[in-house]
Amino acid sequence: MSFAVSLDELPKDLKLESASIYFSWLLKDVLTNLNSSLWLKWPNDFYLEGAKIGGMITNIVGDSMICGVGLNLINSPEGFKNLDIVINREKLLELYYKNIENKLSWKQVFSKYKLEFHRNQNFSTHSDNVKISLKNVELQNDGSIISNGERIYSLR
């Protein structure tokens, strides 16, 4: 699924580099309210237990934020998992778009996200083709992480 949001409609306190966290969290929020146990791995991957079930990509094109979501609803490749609840795709989209329309601030979303950030400790991410352990990184208020003194933003 993909959609576009005007940059003017984004929360004023949202750094564009952290949009993938913002939009991923809004979808995660919908799914956990429907009793899914998924969580958000920094910066934009959906996980169930230790396996990836999807992800979010954001990109600025002109004056719009383009968001693309992939989520294993029914089938998944080997080594991945499916969503742990059954939901109609149209209903999921309806609930997700309503959550986007609520226009939560970055501060509201981030305050919830940082409470679960500890779940990243056994995982890693990549920046400039370098694997970075998330075990000892420091999450910053703008959604970036500090690893070995270097600030890293989600570039997805």
Q: Where are the language model's segments positioned?
A:
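Primarily the active-site beta-strand->alpha-helix module of PP2C/PPM metal-dependent phosphatases
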Residues: M1-S6
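Long, positively charged amphipathic alpha-helical accessory segments at protein N-termini or as interdomain linkers
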Residues: L7-L38, L48-R156
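Short loop/edge segments at beta-strand edges and connector loops
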Residues: L40-W42
